Each structure stands twice: as C-alpha cells, then as structure tokens.
Amino acid sequence: MINLFITASKYIQLLLIVLYTYCNFRYLSIPDQEDADPLCDWQLRIILLVHFLMNCIIYLKTADMSAVWFYLLQLAFFLLYTFGAQRLYRNINRLLLNNTVFFLTYGLIMLERLDAAKAMKQFVIIVGAAALTLVIPYLIDKIWDLVRWRFAFAAFGILLQGVVLIIGATSYGAKMSISIGGFTFQASEIVKITFVLAMAGMLSRATEFRDIVLSSLVAAAHVLVLVACKDLGSALIFCLAYLVMLFIATNRSLYLVLGTAAMGGASVFSYAAFSHVRKRVFAWINPWADIDDRGYQITQSLFAIGTGGFAGLGLYQGMPNRIPIVEKDFIISAISEEMGAITAICIILVCLGCFMQMMVIATYMEDSFYKLVAVGLAIEYIVQSFLTIGGAIKFIPSTGVTLPFISYGGSSLVSAFIVFAIIQALYIIQGNEDEADELEELEEYEETPDDEDEALEEDNAENDAYASEQVSAEDLDL
C-alpha cells in the first residue's frame, strides 16, 4: 500500500508541476494583476499540495517523526511569508512571490532527502533571509536613494573582492569565500548586487563618452579581481550583466560586439592561464576518457539524469549522493533522477518565467536607474541559472555556481532573496505611482462635472438677468 501511494504521488507531482508551469506563463499574458489573482491562488495551492505529498514520502521512507515536525515548520513559514508579504505590500508581484516559495519547496525537499541536517540549516537561513529582506521594498521606496550611493557600492564591491583575493579560502581551484567570526560566506554573491547598483547609477547618469569609459573601468576592476581569484563563473556573470546594461543605457550595438570579442579573448587567456579551467574543459569535452577522476562528476550527473528518465525513480529510489557536491552545483541532476526530467524541465521553465517577469517589470520602469537595476539583476539571475543547469547537463563546462533558492548554500540563498526583494521593490514603486496617477485622473474627472454645472448655472443666471432686462424695457415702453 505504501509503495502504491509513493508511485501515485510521483505521477501526481508531475501533473501538478506541469499545471503550475502553465499557470506561470498564463500569468504573463494577463495585463492586470487583479485579473491574475485567482491564477496565483491556484499556484499557491499547487505548491502546498506538492509540498505535502513529497513530505509524506519522506516520512514513509524514513519513519522519523522529526520529518513531520520539519514539514509543519516549513508549512507555517510558507503561509506566513506568503500572506505576510501580501499584507505588507498591496502591490507585490504575486508571481515572483509564488515562484520563490516554489523554488524553496523543491530545494528543501531534495536537501532533506540528501542530508536532513543540511536541510534544517538551510531552512534556518531561509527564515532569517526572508524576514530581513521583507523590509527592502519599504526601505527602497521610502528611505534609500540608491543612485546617490553608486560610487560607494563600486568601492565596496572592489574592496570586498580584494579581501577575498588576499585572505580568501581556496575551494576547487578558486578563491571565493572568507570566514568572519566562524561564519563563511561567498563574497561574490553579495558583490554581484552592489555591482548592478553601482553600474546602474553610473550609466543612468552618463551624459558623455567619458562617463561610459569610467563605468567600464569600474566594471573591469570588478571582473579583474574575480579573475585573479580564479572565480571565472562569477566573472562571466558580471561581464554579461554589464554588457546588457550598457546596451540598454546607450542603445549602441557596437558595445555588445566589442564586449563579446573581449570576453572571447578572456576565455582563451583563462584556458591558458588556469589549470582548473583546463581540467573542467577537458571533463566537458570528453568526460569518459577519465571517468574515474576529472570526468567523474559530470558522468555521474549524466548517469543520474539518464536513469531517472521523464518520470523519475521516486524519492529515495535513486543514488544522487554518488555525485560530488550534488547539493550545490548539481542539485538539478538529483532532482531529475528522482523526480523526473519533466520536473527538471518545469523548474527550468519557471526560472525562465521569472526572468521574463523581471524584464517586463524593467520595461514598466520610467526611471532609468530603476530600469537598469531590473535589467542587470534579471540578467545575473538567468545567466547564473543557465550556468548551473548547463554545467550539470554537459551543455557547457561546469562553472561552480549555484541554482538560486534551490542549491544548498547560505550566501547564494541570501543573495537570491535580496535580488527578488529589490525587483519586488521596483514593481511596488511603479504600482504605487500608477495608483497615484489613476487617483489624480479620477479626482480631475470628478471635478469636471462640477465645473460644468457651475458654468451652466452662470449661463442660466445670465439668461435670467437678460430676460429681466427685456421685461423691464417693455414695461418702460408701455
């Protein structure tokens, strides 16, 4: 009976995630969010049902009561976070809010299956990050004038990465993290946000060519420090974000061509200069030639994806732990093995849906600074997702970056929450401005009939006065 329930739940989950993905793109075709609210309500119900079914399987497979309590804690958080955010911000984008819960759901399910202790640690960070970032929309809307801090953001990013270069810990050939007070964090996850804010501030105020040169030099300084740290995945994300922001700000395709050529040259240099890059490229080109060493990680990832098929083997039915650092770079492979390629494809499509929604928000922004911030963060988000998934399926060499909200890692998680909070802030600001404009138009419309009535009364009074004068004149004639 238990096996029957597990098998049925697997296929129900597939049906539900396909339906959720459909709702995600259906939302994008509805211009008015109020009309899309019922769709968002259904999305939330689908997420919670998937969450319940998968946690039932976890309990049945582990027979551990702590799994039940952990599920209840997650459920309470999801409900509180979702409805609390909507209560705090009337104009919040519910699609991005639902997708955040969607990603967190699948990330926690797979992490609990892989390592329950890491899942609990991840959940604690989730709660803290969610609570802290809920105030970001208010701060940006009411308090912060971010464009004034553009040079401070740039200096902070370069200095922080410089600290990593000097005292950072080396992991898989690259210096990416530093430890402070027993806490380890990946600096580039924070710097990628300050980088976008700095570049958006500079480009939105650029009026001459020398302003473009200055912003390009600052961007190059960020990238060069990352290259010196051998964190080439982050360097690529920064480069692509800046190139797109530069194109949006100037509308000159020449910058895209020159930037792409420079990135091509930098790639050749990186291959020649860094041994860990050559190792990853070799593993990408022919992992089977050294399957026990350099090609082991990618081959195990491909085996997992192939073994899972479209429907997946089911939770606890596969062997995802054989993939090195599966909970970070290759978590999409674990999801594909046990929950199916259909689930993995739907997650990819929801990532794409988030990117599309971010770009839609960017097009709505009237302020050039806010527009560039939305574009920059959207590009960073989709490029990071592409690098993670592309590396796991052998589409591109592995870069060591994580999948936002899903992969294990505190720095990545906090960074993703901040990115989505900033995008939400921009959406809320624009929504508030639209409401203010509509209210002003309504007040003008309501005042117009009164003006017409007053004019009509004046005309009537003039006509009455004229008629009285005519009558008086006739009386005098008599």
Task: Describe the predicted segments one by one.
Residues 1-17:
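Hydrophobic transmembrane alpha-helical segments in integral membrane proteins
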Residues 22-39:
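Membrane-interface helix-loop junction between the first two transmembrane segments
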Residues 36, 211, 326-334, 371, ...:
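Membrane-interface alpha-helices at helix entry/exit sites of multi-pass transporters
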Residues 64-293, 333-391, 418, 422, ...:
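Hydrophobic alpha-helical transmembrane segments of multi-pass inner membrane proteins, especially
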Residues 179, 216, 293, 297, ...:
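Juxtamembrane loop-helix boundary motifs flanking transmembrane segments in multi-pass membrane proteins
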Residues 305-342, 362-365, 369:
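Long extracytoplasmic/lumenal interhelical loops at the membrane interface
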Residues 394-435:
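Transmembrane alpha-helices of multi-pass inner-membrane enzymes
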